[in-house]
């Protein structure tokens, strides 16, 4: 009898443990698959690719890599003497055509005043036509002067906004061409998080929902708000061939990988450059309000920790 009781007790304990294990596994599985969260999230920021509008030798570089700069602060300067001479030449052309236009205006005025009684209509018309030609040349010279003045101004490259200089790859003495990217500027106070959520979790993601962000390798938890959800993503399994026909990749009907959709998250507080653009984080959407961690069960706390750092 005692042996039977022992067997029943052991069997009952085993059954209870198996049931508890199944419950724990089911809850963990539900927690991981149904709640809107992702480890595939990255800090992003507005980045300006700075390229000069003029070409020439770089005469000075006034900043260093990763420096925080203010709007309109000088970054580097390009060959000002050359463009100063071009401006002086353009101004000389303007002065020449102004003097010529004044002379032709006086001549045309005299001929118009004398009229056909003193000279032929052809001579009068010729004087007026010469005046119009000179005036057009003057307008062209003034436009060239204005462009030369603009080019001279643009030899000084300035920061378009407050931010951090990054990937600075220009040096004094180098020749830089027009339109070639010289440096990137990461705008200050423009950081946000781009989270790539699986399509199966988008039901729990809405603009205005609160979000927890845990940077990889950090114990800090940042908070933010869902700003927007992308309206579309590229279909990688369907392309076009050279004749425009659809090319669709073969797949297994019983294997379906969830597509990831970009979700833009607005941060409550800007972290500066503590978390550089491109670094990764774990994102958890908590719904219409922030999660009260003090009221969570030990199981949920454990799951959150595993989710954030697993």
UniProtKB/Swiss-Prot annotation:
Keywords: Cell inner membrane, Cell membrane, Membrane, Transmembrane, Transmembrane helix, Transport. GO terms for cellular component: plasma membrane. GO terms for molecular function: transmembrane transporter activity. Its main location: membrane. The keyword Nucleotidyltransferase does not apply. It is a single-pass membrane protein. It comes from the Bacteria. Belongs to the membrane fusion protein (MFP) (TC 8.A.1) family. Forms an efflux pump with AaeB. This is p-hydroxybenzoic acid efflux pump subunit AaeA. It comes from Cronobacter sakazakii (strain ATCC BAA-894) (Enterobacter sakazakii).
């Amino acid at each position: 009898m005692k042996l039977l009781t022992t067997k029943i007790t052991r069997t009952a304990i085993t059954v209870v443990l198996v049931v508890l294990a199944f419950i724990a596994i089911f809850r963990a599985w539900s927690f991981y698959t149904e709640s809107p969260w992702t480890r595939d999230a990255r800090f992003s920021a507005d980045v300006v690719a700075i390229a000069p509008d003029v070409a020439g030798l770089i005469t000075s570089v006034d900043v260093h890599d990763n420096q925080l700069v203010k709007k309109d602060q000088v970054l580097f300067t390009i060959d000002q003497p050359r463009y100063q001479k071009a401006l002086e030449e353009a101004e000389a052309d303007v002065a020449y055509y102004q003097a010529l236009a004044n002379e032709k205006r006086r001549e045309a005025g005299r001929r118009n005043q004398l009229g056909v009684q003193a000279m032929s209509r052809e001579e009068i018309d010729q004087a007026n036509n010469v005046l119009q030609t000179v005036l057009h040349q003057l307008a062209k010279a003034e436009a060239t002067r204005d462009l030369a003045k603009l080019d001279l101004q643009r030899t000084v490259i300035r920061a378009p906004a407050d931010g951090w200089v990054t990937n600075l790859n220009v040096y004094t003495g180098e020749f830089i061409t027009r339109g070639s990217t010289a440096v990137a500027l990461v705008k200050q106070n423009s950081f946000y998080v781009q989270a790539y959520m699986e399509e199966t979790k988008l039901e729990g993601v809405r603009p205005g929902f609160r979000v927890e962000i845990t940077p990889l390798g950090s114990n800090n938890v940042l908070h933010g708000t869902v700003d927007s959800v992308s309206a579309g993503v590229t279909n990688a399994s369907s392309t076009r061939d050279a004749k425009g026909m659809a090319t669709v990749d073969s797949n297994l009907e019983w294997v379906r990988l969830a597509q990831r959709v970009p979700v833009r998250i607005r941060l409550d507080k800007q972290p500066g450059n503590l978390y550089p653009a491109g670094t990764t984080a774990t994102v958890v959407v908590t719904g219409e309000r922030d999660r009260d961690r003090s009221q969570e069960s030990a199981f949920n706390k454990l799951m959150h920790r595993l989710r954030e750092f697993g």
